[in-house]
């Protein structure tokens, strides 16, 4: 699992001087600025396979009880109950439309004998005779129908909760009357309901009319306890007010600014025009059969006027998650059939990439706070004639879906001449009328939009909307940043790495096996590994440092500890009462046991603390002398060394990534064995395990207790020639006991002799290992 090279990587045994550290820190800082710009996203890393992603939920939840609010004067909206909590006697509220409706509610405390009291109503002093002999508060609703009329008591509410209610609804004003908890509602007519305003003198709450049952409950039984806590502070009603500001069609807002960079918020109204692409493929033969009718991505370029500005836009429309249908009219050559035709339905998604030549898209490299809102559009299918050689031909007709905006992200459009940083709008679909059918066939009344004629003769479909984003751009608007015309530093490196990966994989066919075995006989270390690089490198030591720092963050460091801990912990935790017969299926006792301790191994992620544990629990043989064993990692290291020497593109910038990838990806399926006297116990990374005798190669029961002792006390050898290959070699050619021992130990001299003799079984095994050394 860890050869000499990878052991050096894990232990990080190299020392560096101050110059190397400064150079490393400087390169990391430069890369960090370019690659990881905080909250910004890079546009050129669009995913390859697009799913619908998150589904935005814009459901608005209206609270049952809103408040409390401070006393105020305002014109209340219709369809809302206003619950007013009176804390003292006197006027609770006054309400009028200055036309035919004047009403005021007066609170009188309990145990008041008949008396005259003065009140100020609508700016005038009024005297009323009041009386309250009960233990509850009384609220007198005083009403008059004209400005010159006198007030009279229209209704009275007796309550121990000191709550009164008022509602504007259906051309009437509704209030509560009677005695709680049996109070009911009643109403007063008015010809001018909308102009009624209210002056409230106490704290109040707001409840939508849809929750009128809750309002009745509060009037009869009082507010819930949480509303009476001293932590609830009444707010001004103005806190509910929304200042409406009509947005401009084009808005460029400076969010922040420094000497070199600034954040600009771009708000744009846009018109999106798009069309579906499709492909109809006909089978050969007599002309009665079609192979495929499918959706294809379609580009569309157009111009439109936006706030006096002429905008040139480009869209690309594609369909994801289509449904495959077919029609088979019979088995005869003259029977009409369609092998596959695509239909977009509710489970499908439409993606529209949009770009225009405005300033918003000029420097769209680092973007945050991206939002959009687009209207829906209905797409109706047309007719497509399946023109048969003879007779009336079938016609696919109809079908419709509606596109609903479901999200937006960054993307890159690739045209014939240029790649464009763009916005990708995602639309969910709902099926609509009409249904589609294939006339003169049994296919009728199906819903969705088939790919036969999705545009229905229209040049394009159109929708409108608006998007907003914040982009990091240069402060100097006159300076044309190269970002818009080139790729970033990381993308240049990715391109180099991709080219290097392709070259490495193609070199697998050119590696001579004898050269590989000879190379494996040498003790490869960091310095010999990097000696073949043809580009200029200042110091091999600094190169090794870069590789180790990259390797330390790789997946291999964690996977090594997980694998080794699973070997020893699983063996020690298994049942010690019986031996386990070898099991070649991936669902084995070994697999289940190793899974049981995976949580423990996963919880430890510190590489530096695990390397000491690895060396104690599992000691791997590296290739040091001709008689010592050679591990899988020695094969992969030898392949890596050979490819580095043969490569024309390797350099100091790409080497750390390539070495790290090679350690993770070379030879993913590996086997390991322990040897004790005449017995071999072998396991692989797929969970298979078995034991066998060296002299006969016959399987024996797998003793997990014995394995638990051997795996911690004996060397573990990587199985270059695995048990399957050994059995095949013995069955076809016959091998001696000494040859079997040497092959089990992965002796390089014996391997080279078999290869020089052109043994097809050994040669094929080594070739397969080389082919597995791919990136």
From Swiss-Prot:
Give the motif span (YGL motif).
447-449
Q: Where is this site: Cleavage?
A: 230-231, 240-241, 246-247
Cystine links in this protein are: 317-379
Locate the region Spike head: 65-223
Which parts of this chain are annotated as the region Spike foot?
509-775
What Gene Ontology terms for biological process does this UniProt record contain? permeabilization of host organelle membrane involved in viral entry into host cell; virion attachment to host cell
The family database entries (InterPro entries) matched by this protein are listed as: ConA-like_dom_sf, Rota_A_VP4, Rota_VP4_MID, Rota_VP4_MID_sf, VP4_concanavalin-like, VP4_helical
Residue ranges of the motif KID motif: 643-645
Coiled coil where?
A: 483-510
Other information: In group A rotaviruses, VP4 defines the P serotype. Some rotavirus strains are neuraminidase-sensitive and require sialic acid to attach to the cell surface. Some rotavirus strains are integrin-dependent. Some rotavirus strains depend on ganglioside for their entry into the host cell. Hsp70 also seems to be involved in the entry of some strains.
Entry GO CC: host cell endoplasmic reticulum-Golgi intermediate compartment; host cell plasma membrane; host cell rough endoplasmic reticulum; host cytoskeleton; membrane; viral outer capsid
Q: Which UniProt keywords apply?
A: Capsid protein, Coiled coil, Disulfide bond, Hemagglutinin, Host cell membrane, Host cytoplasm, Host cytoskeleton, Host endoplasmic reticulum, Host membrane, Host-virus interaction, Membrane, Outer capsid protein, Viral attachment to host cell, Viral penetration into host cytoplasm, Viral penetration via permeabilization of host membrane, Virion, Virus entry into host cell
Q: Where is this region: Hydrophobic?
A: 388-408
Q: Where is this motif: DGE motif?
A: 307-309
Protein name stated in the entry: Outer capsid protein VP4
Q: Family, per the entry? A: Belongs to the rotavirus VP4 family.
Q: Where is this region: Spike body and stalk (antigen domain)?
A: 247-478
């Amino acid at each position: 699992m860890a050869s000499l090279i990878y052991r050096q990587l894990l232990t990080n045994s190299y020392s560096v001087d101050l110059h190397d550290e400064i150079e490393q820190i400087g390169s990391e800082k430069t890369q960090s600025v370019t690659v990881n710009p905080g909250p910004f996203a890079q546009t050129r890393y669009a995913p390859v396979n697009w799913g619908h992603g998150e589904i935005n939920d814009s459901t608005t939840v209206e609270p049952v009880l809103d408040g409390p609010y401070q006393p105020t004067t305002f014109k209340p909206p219709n369809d809302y109950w206003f619950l007013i909590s009176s804390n003292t006697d006197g006027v609770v509220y006054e309400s009028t439309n200055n036309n035919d409706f004047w009403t005021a509610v007066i609170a009188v405390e309990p145990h008041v004998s008949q008396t005259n009291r003065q009140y100020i109503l609508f700016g005038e002093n009024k005297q009323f005779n009041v009386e309250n002999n009960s233990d509850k508060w009384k609220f007198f609703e005083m009403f008059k129908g004209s400005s010159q009329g006198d007030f009279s008591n229209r209704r009275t509410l007796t309550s121990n909760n000191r709550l009164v209610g008022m509602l504007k609804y259906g051309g009437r004003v509704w209030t509560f009357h009677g005695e709680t908890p049996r109070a009911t509602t009643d109403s007063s007519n008015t010809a001018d309901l909308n102009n009624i305003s209210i002056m409230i003198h106490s704290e109040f709450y707001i409840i939508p009319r849809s929750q009128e049952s809750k309002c009745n409950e509060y009037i009869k039984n009082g507010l819930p306890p949480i509303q009476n806590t001293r932590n609830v502070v009444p707010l001004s009603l103005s806190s509910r007010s929304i200042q409406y500001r009509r947005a401009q069609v084009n808005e460029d807002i400076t969010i922040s600014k420094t000497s070199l960079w600034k954040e600009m918020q771009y708000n744009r109204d846009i018109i999106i025009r798009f069309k579906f692409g499709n492909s109809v493929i006909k089978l050969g033969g007599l002309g009665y059969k079609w192979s495929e009718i499918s959706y294809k991505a379609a580009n569309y370029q157009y111009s439109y006027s936006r706030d006096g500005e002429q905008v040139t836009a480009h869209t690309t429309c594609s369909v994801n998650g289509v449904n495959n249908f077919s029609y088979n009219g019979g088995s005869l050559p003259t029977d009409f059939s369609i092998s596959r035709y695509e239909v977009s339905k509710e489970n499908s998604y439409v993606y529209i990439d949009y770009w225009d030549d405005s300033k918003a898209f000029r420097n769209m490299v680092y973007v945050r706070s991206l939002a959009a809102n687009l209207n829906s559009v209905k797409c109706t299918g047309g007719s497509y004639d399946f023109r048969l050689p003879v007779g009336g031909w079938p016609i696919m007709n109809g079908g419709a879906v509606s596109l609903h905006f479901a999200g937006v992200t960054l993307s890159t459009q690739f045209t014939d001449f240029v790649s464009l940083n763009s916005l990708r709008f995602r639309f969910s679909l709902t099926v609509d009328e009409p249904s589609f059918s294939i006339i003169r066939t049994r296919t009728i009344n199906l819903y969705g939009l088939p790919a036969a004629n999705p545009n229905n003769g229209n040049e394009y479909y159109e929708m409108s909307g608006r998007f907003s984003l914040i982009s990091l751009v240069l402060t100097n608007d006159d300076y044309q940043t190269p970002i818009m015309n080139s790729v970033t530093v990381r993308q240049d490196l990715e391109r180099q790495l991709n080219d290097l990966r392709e070259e490495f994989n193609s070199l697998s066919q050119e590696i001579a096996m004898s050269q590989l075995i000879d190379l494996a006989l040498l003790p490869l270390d960091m310095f010999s590994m990097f000696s073949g690089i043809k580009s200029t490198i200042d110091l091999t030591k600094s190169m090794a440092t870069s590789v180790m720092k990259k390797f330390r963050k790789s997946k291999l460091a964690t996977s090594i500890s997980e694998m080794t801990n699973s070997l020893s912990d699983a063996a020690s935790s298994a049942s010690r009462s019986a031996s386990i017969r070898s099991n070649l299926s991936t669902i084995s006792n070994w697999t289940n046991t190793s899974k049981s301790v995976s949580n423990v191994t996963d919880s430890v992620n510190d590489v530096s603390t695990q390397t000491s544990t690895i060396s104690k629990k599992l000691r791997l043989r590296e290739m040091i002398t001709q008689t010592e064993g050679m591990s899988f990692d020695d094969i992969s290291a030898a392949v890596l060394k050979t490819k580095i020497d043969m490569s024309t593109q390797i350099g100091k910038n790409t080497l750390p990534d390539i070495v790290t990838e090679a350690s993770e990806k070379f030879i993913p399926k590996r086997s390991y064995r322990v040897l004790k006297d005449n017995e071999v116990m072998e396991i692989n990374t797929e969970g298979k395990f078995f034991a066998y005798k060296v002299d006969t190669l016959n399987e024996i029961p797998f003793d997990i207790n014995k394995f638990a002792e051997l795996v911690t006390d004996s060397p573990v050898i990587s199985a270059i020639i695995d048990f399957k290959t050994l059995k095949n070699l013995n069955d076809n050619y016959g091998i001696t006991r000494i040859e079997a021992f040497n092959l089990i130990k992965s002796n390089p001299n014996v391997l080279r002799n078999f290869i020089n003799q052109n043994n097809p079984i050994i040669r094929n095994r080594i070739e397969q290992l080389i082919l597995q050394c791919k990136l």
